[in-house]
Amino acid sequence: MKALWAVLVVTLLAGCLAEGEPELEPEVTDRLAWQSGQPWELALGRFWDYLRWVQTLSDQVQEELQSSQVTQELTVLMEDTMTELKAYKKELEEQLGPMAEETRARLAKEVQAAQSRLGADMEDLRNRLGQYRNEVQTMLGQSTEELRARLSTHLRKLRKRLMRDAEDLQKRLAVYKAGAREGAERGVGAIRERLGPLVEQGRQRTANLGAGAGKPLQDRAQALGARIRGRLEEVGNQARDRLEEVREQMEEVRAKVEEQAQQMRLQAEIFQARLKGWFEPLVEDMQRQWANLVEKIQASVAANPIPPSSVPQESQ
């Protein structure tokens, strides 16, 4: 029980610090800074720009959110991004050339995982907007301010996750591209080796034997390092996501507490008004009865004056 209270206190302090010093947003307001002109990056940039417009929650956005227009636009942009991404990945696979099978499989697996995370982020965004539309439709004639605030918080969180996963995918594709370039260079080296003189071929074969002995170790070391880095990044991402969830839950709890307090104040005011309405007529009636009684007493005294008492005189 003490441990639970300690965790709650730490969470509250973290929320207070977050309110006192707001977290700085990454510089992503104009364009994605890491874009290098690849078609899939340009398609993702269009998705990002549309998301920035949706996040303003302007009157036009609110109007279009009532229909399926926003989710349809996001679906088209998602499909364009995934199509361009698959085409770019296929192009890199064709350029890989000769490469260790373990390295090829590892790179392909990492890129596929990063691609899946990016697609899941886009899908979560679309689903969240669809959920908001359904919630608004069920609250016709009521205030949707709380729904808009909650949507803004979720969009900010999803946008950060989308940015992080997009950068991770770009980095892994860069490694994939470097592997393709290395494979092409190895292919040219192999042709040069076959066309060289016999002495050069023998010397090259000897050098390749030495390199071949160390290559599996190098590949395994690279694979192990990549797995360790991936695991550390995953743990860090999970910790950040968990912290965001805790903060979001605390914000929701605080909003509910404030709402309940406001309702209690309103109920107290209503009860006070009812009490006043009950007792005011009673007090006024008692005052009227008391005034009538006083008037009657005064009238009775005026009509029947008390005669002066006779005092007997003493005999002299």
UniProtKB/Swiss-Prot annotation:
> Organism's domain of life?
Eukaryota
Q: Does the keyword Cell membrane apply?
A: no
A Gene Ontology biological process term: cholesterol efflux
Ranges where the record places region Specificity for association with VLDL: 274-286
The UniProt entry, under SUPFAM superfamilies, shows: Apolipoprotein A-I
Residue ranges, annotated region (Homooligomerization): 262-316
In which broad location class does this protein mainly occur, judging by the first location in its UniProt entry?
A: secreted
Q: Which Pfam families match?
A: Apolipoprotein (PF01442)
Q: Which organism is it from?
A: Onychomys torridus
**What interactions and quaternary structure are annotated?**
Homotetramer. May interact with ABCA1; functionally associated with ABCA1 in the biogenesis of HDLs. May interact with APP/A4 amyloid-beta peptide; the interaction is extremely stable in vitro but its physiological significance is unclear. May interact with MAPT. May interact with MAP2. In the cerebrospinal fluid, interacts with secreted SORL1. Interacts with PMEL; this allows the loading of PMEL luminal fragment on ILVs to induce fibril nucleation.
User: What keywords appear on the UniProt entry?
Assistant: Chylomicron, Endosome, Extracellular matrix, Glycoprotein, HDL, Heparin-binding, Lipid transport, Lipid-binding, Oxidation, Phosphoprotein, Repeat, Secreted, Signal, Transport, VLDL
Region span, 8 X 22 AA approximate tandem repeats:
76-251
UniProt modified residues of type Methionine sulfoxide: M139
Show the taxonomic lineage: Eukaryota, Metazoa, Chordata, Craniata, Vertebrata
Q: sequence repeats located where?
A: 76-97, 98-119, 120-141, 142-163, 164-185, 186-207, 208-229, 230-251
Name by which UniProt lists this protein: Apolipoprotein E
PTM annotation, UniProt: APOE exists as multiple glycosylated and sialylated glycoforms within cells and in plasma. The extent of glycosylation and sialylation are tissue and context specific.
State the signal peptide span.
Answer: 1-18
The task this protein performs is described as: APOE is an apolipoprotein, a protein associating with lipid particles, that mainly functions in lipoprotein-mediated lipid transport between organs via the plasma and interstitial fluids. APOE is a core component of plasma lipoproteins and is involved in their production, conversion and clearance. Apolipoproteins are amphipathic molecules that interact both with lipids of the lipoprotein particle core and the aqueous environment of the plasma.
Q: Please report which protein family the annotation says this sequence is part of.
A: Belongs to the apolipoprotein A1/A4/E family.
One annotated GO molecular function? phospholipid binding
Entry's localization field: Secreted; Secreted, Extracellular space; Secreted, Extracellular space, Extracellular matrix; Extracellular vesicle
Residue segments, region LDL and other lipoprotein receptors binding: 154-164
